[in-house]
Amino acid sequence: MTAFKQGDPTTLNRLYGRSIGKPLRTHQQHLVDNLLPQISPPAEGPVTAERLFGEDCPLHFEIGFGGGEHLVYRADLLPNHGFIGAEPFLNGVASCLSQVEEQRLANIRIHNGDALEVLDRVPDGALTMLYLLHPDPWPKNKHAKRRMMNDGPVKMFADKLKPGGEFRFGTDHPVYLRHALMVMRRHTDAFEWVVEGPSDWQNRPSGWPETRYEHKARTKFGHEVWYFRFRRR
Ligand SMILES: C[S@@+](CC[C@H](N)C(=O)[O-])C[C@H]1O[C@@H](n2cnc3c(N)ncnc32)[C@H](O)[C@@H]1O
């Protein structure tokens, strides 16, 4: 994750965590070499629906999509919406590219790198939805500034979402949960927590599929998972 530095509106411009794992299979490498450049957002300038998809459409952004299960599910569900996913871990990107190819999804753009670099270039008020699912927890206090949920990024999330737009956040990590809610309490001027009672954060909302990461958290580690929806005021 990138870290927030006081006085820096976005990030330290530094990635933490791994960006490559085991070697890619031949076809995955082919997709990274050929499909990825075709569906990457432009390296410079504004990141708009018109530039990415050739027309105005509701824009969604997923930060750290892992293997892309959620991104692909959402894009398939909403074919007339445009989806941008950012993920620095190349093996995750390769897995997402395979799904994009198999399902012939024309409404996904993928950035292999830091989400905040691309999000920063999305015009203010342009996003309909923003997703942050199971961000790296950085559980030690001394690493708290590396967490994606910090005042700088959250301020940027607020800027990029349109009024009525939604920020979805999920975690299975109790330390991150407490930290995230503390941060969000500082941004109640921008975000309204869409909640009526505990079942709202204990049960997965419809249209929010389980990722492989989440499945493992539940079944292998016995973790609870918490779901949050925040509406941009
Ligand atoms: C615990 S995984 C969760 C993956 C996925 N969201 C899921 O729920 O399955 C956290 C992901 O965030 C990614 N990540 C870390 N820093 C990031 C950054 N600055 N921008 C985008 N993604 C980042 C990691 O590479 C990793 O894939």
Swiss-Prot record:
<feature type="binding site">
    <location>
        <position position="114"/>
    </location>
    <ligand>
        <name>S-adenosyl-L-methionine</name>
    </ligand>
</feature>
<feature type="binding site">
    <location>
        <position position="62"/>
    </location>
    <ligand>
        <name>S-adenosyl-L-methionine</name>
    </ligand>
</feature>
<keyword id="KW-0819">tRNA processing</keyword>
<feature type="binding site">
    <location>
        <position position="87"/>
    </location>
    <ligand>
        <name>S-adenosyl-L-methionine</name>
    </ligand>
</feature>
<dbReference type="InterPro" id="IPR055361">
    <property type="entry name" value="tRNA_methyltr_TrmB_bact"/>
</dbReference>
<comment type="similarity">
    <text>Belongs to the class I-like SAM-binding methyltransferase superfamily. TrmB family.</text>
</comment>
<feature type="binding site">
    <location>
        <begin position="211"/>
        <end position="214"/>
    </location>
    <ligand>
        <name>substrate</name>
    </ligand>
</feature>
<keyword id="KW-0489">Methyltransferase</keyword>
<dbReference type="GO" id="GO:0008176">
    <property type="term" value="F:tRNA (guanine(46)-N7)-methyltransferase activity"/>
</dbReference>
<keyword id="KW-0808">Transferase</keyword>
<feature type="active site">
    <location>
        <position position="136"/>
    </location>
</feature>
<feature type="binding site">
    <location>
        <position position="136"/>
    </location>
    <ligand>
        <name>S-adenosyl-L-methionine</name>
    </ligand>
</feature>
<comment type="function">
    <text>Catalyzes the formation of N(7)-methylguanine at position 46 (m7G46) in tRNA.</text>
</comment>
<dbReference type="Pfam" id="PF02390">
    <property type="entry name" value="Methyltransf_4"/>
</dbReference>
<feature type="binding site">
    <location>
        <position position="140"/>
    </location>
    <ligand>
        <name>substrate</name>
    </ligand>
</feature>
<keyword id="KW-0949">S-adenosyl-L-methionine</keyword>
<feature type="binding site">
    <location>
        <position position="172"/>
    </location>
    <ligand>
        <name>substrate</name>
    </ligand>
</feature>
<dbReference type="InterPro" id="IPR003358">
    <property type="entry name" value="tRNA_(Gua-N-7)_MeTrfase_Trmb"/>
</dbReference>
<dbReference type="GO" id="GO:0043527">
    <property type="term" value="C:tRNA methyltransferase complex"/>
</dbReference>
<dbReference type="InterPro" id="IPR029063">
    <property type="entry name" value="SAM-dependent_MTases_sf"/>
</dbReference>
<comment type="pathway">
    <text>tRNA modification; N(7)-methylguanine-tRNA biosynthesis.</text>
</comment>
<protein>
    <recommendedName>
        <fullName>tRNA (guanine-N(7)-)-methyltransferase</fullName>
        <ecNumber>2.1.1.33</ecNumber>
    </recommendedName>
</protein>
